[in-house]
Amino acid sequence: MSKKSAETVKVVVRCRPMNSKEISQGHKRIVEMDNKRGLVEVTNPKGPPGEPNKSFTFDTVYDWNSKQIDLYDETFRSLVESVLQGFNGTIFAYGQTGTGKTFTMEGVRSNPELRGVIPNSFEHIFTHIARTQNQQFLVRASYLEIYQEEIRDLLAKDQKKRLDLKERPDTGVYVKDLSSFVTKSVKEIEHVMTVGNNNRSVGSTNMNEHSSRSHAIFIITIECSELGVDGENHIRVGKLNLVDLAGSERQAKTGATGDRLKEATKINLSLSALGNVISALVDGKSSHIPYRDSKLTRLLQDSLGGNAKTVMVANMGPASYNFDETITTLRYANRAKNIKNKPKINEDPKDALLREFQEEISRLKQALDKKGPSDGRKKGKKRKPGEQGGDDDIEDETEEEGDEMDEEEMYKESQQKLEEEKEKIMANQSMIAEEKQKLLSEVQKRQGEIKKEHQQKEMLEGKIKAMESKLLVGGKSIVDHTNEQQRKIEEQRLLLAEEKNRERDMERKLKEQDDKTVEIEGTFSSLQQEVEVKTKKLKKLFAKLQSYKSDIQDLQDEHARERQELEQTQNELIRELKLKKVIADNFIPVEERTKITTRAVFDEETEEWLLTPLAKAEGPSQMAKRPVSAVGNRRPIADYARMAAQMGGNPRYKAENILSVDLDMPNRTTRDYEGPSVAPRVQAALDAALQDEDDLDLEVQPEVFKAKTKLKKDKVRSKHKAVAKPGSNSQLYPQARGLIQK
């Protein structure tokens, strides 16, 4: 049965070491940590010399010398173990930007000593599955990010696609259309995470070169099937949410501008909403928890005050210039200690994928059995789905392999017999051709049927193997002796972690008891001793008083700062609202504005304003679809009318009330260009030659050339004289002169 018990959120604090940039700039370390007592003390660098340190106590604290594996074994191993038992679990890192949240969650996967919570949890989950017996597991992985209040799937092809949050009474809040991948090993789930990390939004600021610009959530769903006492399979589903939050930041320190500033604004708003949820959960007076203020708080609704076991890692920096952010982080973490969750085991959920897999495998096996086993095939022992055993499993596997071999041999043998039968028919000369053809066709038909049946069986067996390969079953690949040793080592680790926690609690209680004992003991041996004791008590009380006064002043300053930021945001929003109102008043008619405002409705699920339909539609859609006969037209049209419209211009057969009229073209005022028939150079030479010019005296030419030229001129002149008769009225043309011959 599902057990439900209240337990508080476990809060641990981790402080990173000083980096080279902080040391070079002369900043000092202001944080001191006592790992045994779980105590964190912070010194105010700007306070007066006598101001006491601010102290905070947590479940566990880790200083700058802590190791990744110690953090996992002492804090997170028990949580992952409970997820394997069917609980919901959440691990999230909280703190200022550049304090090591991503290093705590992911670390360096290539180095075993520097691996973070997520890679260590992968190893833990699949090692546990490999060592279990009589259980079936199905492991799925999803990866999403919240970037500027938009949910994106980091494993999808289109990362820019926005996903919506939905809520159901049985499962709670979930992301619609979020992709999920079935993984069978550490290597496969690490590949899924690598693909998601490559798609995640990362940027550079003055405080962090690889600053996460979005909140990322890696979701591991572990489904386990086990045979119960009643003989039925019972499924438990555990979900592990590994959350890497983007850090809160101030624009003055990060130097963010443009897109980085927009990202920082959205990050700070969502983290502010997370802080408000934590404050409301701790404050018993508040009846409303503002989960809907951001997408992050809605996704973490079960983790904060719901059905989950939660561990919060508060990361902080030790440098003096981060005093305000460090104090704010510690205060939020101190509040979160008082949040109470009610985790329960998720047994037999309706949407368990493992059950669907088992039912599908059972259906395929029944379909395979209906095909009928061959004569030589052995019938193995039937088992119920989910029932597994050590040696029996190995024997059953060998039997199944033997069955497959027998089936293949029987198929080959039947094919060989049919081939021999075909050869006998072909060799028989006494048969009539028609009878021989009929027998051959029957044999070929039987061959085809056997082949088809064999292919169907192979296809079903392939599907069964593919689906069974996704179900993880332990106790086969690892020797039982090694499993037992690993179990003992894990038990010892858990015992050591519990002993350390008990030791811290005992030291804390002893310290409180000592203080109470001194107060109760009122007997003193002398007046001097009484004065010393009371002076010491007075100093301690005065130090507490000063500490409380300092806390009150800090809270007032923080409240004033938050109020100033809210007022600034409010002024910006009012200015933007006024601008839009001026645009609406001057450019949108009053009637149209009234229509829109009366139809506007705010949808809390999508957090958007929607317009209600003008008329109530009975069906799912308001507008009716176009008829099939009117594709591309306003109204239906017959085939005859369509053909008539194509053949002629009769407006009767037109689908639209529009007449097709030819364009009325104006009279032409220009003419086409006609190029010259003779080249310009040749025409120029001809024009020059046809002009009347004096005879040219070419003295440089030889005598022979002059004589020939003179003879030619005489001949030409004589011809012209013969043509032109005296007393004729015919037009006289100019005579050719120069070097051009006519």
From Swiss-Prot:
Record-linked Gene3D superfamilies: Kinesin motor domain
InterPro entries associated with the record: Kinesin-like_fam, Kinesin_motor_CS, Kinesin_motor_dom, Kinesin_motor_dom_sf, P-loop_NTPase
Name of the protein in its database record: Kinesin-II 95 kDa subunit
Keyword hit for ATP-binding: yes
Gene: KRP95
Source organism of this protein record: Strongylocentrotus purpuratus
Lineage: Eukaryota, Metazoa, Echinodermata, Eleutherozoa, Echinozoa
UniProt region (Globular), positions on chain: 614-742
Compartmental location: Cytoplasm, Cytoskeleton
Amino acid composition bias (Basic and acidic residues), ranges on this chain: 365-377, 411-425
Self-association state and partner proteins as the record states: Heterotrimer of a 115 kDa subunit (KAP115) and two kinesin-like subunits of 95 kDa (KRP95) and 85 kDa (KRP85).
Family listed: Belongs to the TRAFAC class myosin-kinesin ATPase superfamily. Kinesin family. Kinesin II subfamily.
